[in-house]
Amino acid sequence: MSTGAQTKAAAASQHADGPRLLADVGGTNARFALETGPGEITQIRVYPGAEYPTLTDAIRKYLKDAKIGRVNHAAIAIANPVDGDQVRMTNHNWSFSIEATRRALGFDTLLVVNDFTALAMALPGLTDAQRVQIGGGTRRQNSVIGLMGPGTGLGVSGLIPADDRWIALGSEGGHATFAPMDEREDLVLQYARRKYPHVSFERVCAGPGMEIIYRALAARDKKRIAANVDTADIVERAHAGDALALEAVECFCAILGTFAGNLAVTLGALGGIYIGGGVVPKLGELFMRSPFRARFEAKGRFEAYLANIPTYLITAEYPAFLGVSAILAEQLSNRTGGASSAVFERIRQMRDALTPAERRVADLALNHPRSIINDPIVNIARKADVSQPTVIRFCRSLGCQGLSDFKLKLATGLTGTIPMSHSQVHLGDTATDFGAKVLDNTVSAILQLREHLNFEHVEQAIDILNNARRIEFYGLGNSNIVAQDAHYKFFRFGIPTIAYGDLYMQAASAALLGKGDVIVAVSKSGRAPELLRVLDVAMQAGAKVIAITSSNTPLAKRATVALETDHIEMRESQLSMISRILHLVMIDILAVGVAIRRAAPNAELAEAMARAKARAGASAGDEAADVLDWLSHGAAPAAKD
């Protein structure tokens, strides 16, 4: 940790995009720090969580106390599982949206990770001075590492080596069911069951668990204990030699050893087991003399296996900051130089070839990408201190058609910060909040469709449509909107098409179809029995069915080709929103595919196109090229003379 003194070398190594906010948020306290450069962590402050209504309030208080200007990037390690955008703390009353918090604080980047995932990322960099070995064993290089730590809860994580980097495991292993190893622990379990229907290891070997053990032993000895006795009091009494407190600490450490052994054999942690958290360091010599290590190795046939695995107590000050700093640095590195963010790599490569004015726009895009995405051109020009035409020239220098095209590519490069899980809209959300959630949910669904769509099925569907004699689009209810949109696009290809949203008309028309005809059935549920019966009639007559629906539905299983668009809607009872967008996107993909096939006709279609040209006075290929240009909003390449 830096002392805060600035040397010339330190100044030279400062982050170009300004100081980064680091946070370690536990169930009791929130710790904050600023990282001014790699390894330069300063202004560490601790705030009691109970004094602030929200996490945002605590961060604002810290930024005010630290007297820091704008912070662009922040990362938070939190004592809670992190799955998606919404975080609701288990051991505290804070609940927040990551994206809403980022917007409220004006950050370009806000990462939130499990605190033990962050702590795990700090382990490879710990020196011998920052850890103390307990017992024997020798760690094996480039092997799995386990991490655990009792604090307000019982954190668990692990590190897996992968080439030249480490992958941290997010885990809630502390909630595994507690299994007693002796009669004393049986007594503790029975006592804890009076209060908790499920007794996890966290209940008995996190900080509050020591109080449960102490009271269970007191009840055994028929001793009365004051209601206000807590873990800190028990540890203090143990250090003073109190027999009951000493036994409680001994039992606590033994249970912790059992859990550590479980973690070691589960992960195959030949790189060692590390102990963090705030409780064990306060035990001092009591822990060193405890049965922790003996219980760790007590695994019967696997005793020799565990005897070779070392266990360490982390003694580094604020180690979670080191880990969360590494995670944030990797995220920002991927953005500016990783293969997954080509637009940022392109800006970096082109920067030296740009004019000085264009470089200022490039720097704004690299350091404040969301400002480029969200602001109108007048604000972008003002922030970069350039003219509006310079902004456009910069975009075109990167090969973009204009600012809108550049914004789209930039947003794609930022997908790592777009929540890839569903965010619920709640009563009381502002227009900013629920509007952002609707947009984020839609973007997330489209990105996931891109990752999971079966493009072999897409190719098959395009082949079927391109060779169809007639195409009919069926959609009931809200899906009829998609069917009508598809009809509007496909009829321009010169293929007879029609859309039906009425079940009676669908049944009447399907009875007339046969070989060479195609039905595109659009359905969110894929379970309407009437629609399935209509499709059966058409397929028995030789027609083919392309289904745009969810996976593993009766419609998907029955269709000739299924294009599956799985997603999450906010509520099943309301009109489909995300599914409609995904279905429209699928229609666009199919239409573009057919347009490409028809704009570059093969020899077998030449005669048919010649006849079409004679009748219509224009080439069918030219017509398809026009449709392709229309579908791509003018972005399709111009045909050569």
From Swiss-Prot:
Its EC number is 2.7.1.2. Keywords: ATP-binding, DNA-binding, Glycolysis, Kinase, Membrane, Multifunctional enzyme, Nucleotide-binding, Transcription, Transcription regulation, Transferase, Transmembrane, Transmembrane helix. Residues 341-417 form the HTH rpiR-type domain. The chain crosses the membrane at residues 576-596. Residues 461-600 form the SIS domain. Residues 341-641 are annotated as: Putative HTH-type transcriptional regulator. ATP binds at residues 23-28. One of its GO terms (cellular component) is cytosol. It catalyses: D-glucose + ATP = D-glucose 6-phosphate + ADP + H(+). Residues 377-396 bind DNA. GO terms for molecular function: ATP binding; D-glucose binding; DNA binding; DNA-binding transcription factor activity; glucokinase activity. It is found in: Membrane. This is Bifunctional protein glk. It is a single-pass membrane protein. In the N-terminal section; belongs to the bacterial glucokinase family. Pfam families: Glucokinase, HTH_6, SIS. GO terms for biological process: glycolytic process. PROSITE patterns: HTH_RPIR, SIS. Residues 1-340 are annotated as: Glucokinase.
